[in-house]
Amino acid sequence: GRLNRYNANPDSVWSDIVHNKEFLGLTSNITRLPGSNSWKIGNYRRGTNLVAYKVIKLADSLHLPQHFIGWDTEWQLNASEQMRQVDSLIQKVGKLTIKKRTNQKHVVVLLHDFLFRTSTSLTHLTYFIEQLQIKYKCKFEWIENYPGV
């Protein structure tokens, strides 16, 4: 599809990333690749599909101190509309905090700003955060504080 065509040229993808970071005034060496749940933090790699791998390999070949971070779970559109979907996501995140895995107590939830344009969706997001803090003692931090970054 459209993302595959976009990602076909890693030089262009990287150029876009650099341009967008400069335009937005971002100085972080952390990147999320569009349409790709791919990770590279130091020597750790996870879920690097072929397209993402090419971009990551390019950054490595340029000796860029770049981290690529994906997500452990994501907020789906139906969670913005249905509270039961929010409860399901709360349980999923809670389970991830106790599951044996790399960076066990650290969970990245992918959220897209366009999913929070209604008062209902904002109420659901507030509930999500509060319930994770109450039930699982979750702490929310900037991605820059993720282990290894």
Feature-to-residue mapping (PLM):
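Catalytic domains of cell-wall/extracellular-matrix polysaccharide-remodeling enzymes
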Residues: 1-133
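Low-complexity, Gly/Ser/Thr/Pro-rich intrinsically disordered linker/tail segments
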Residues: 123-149
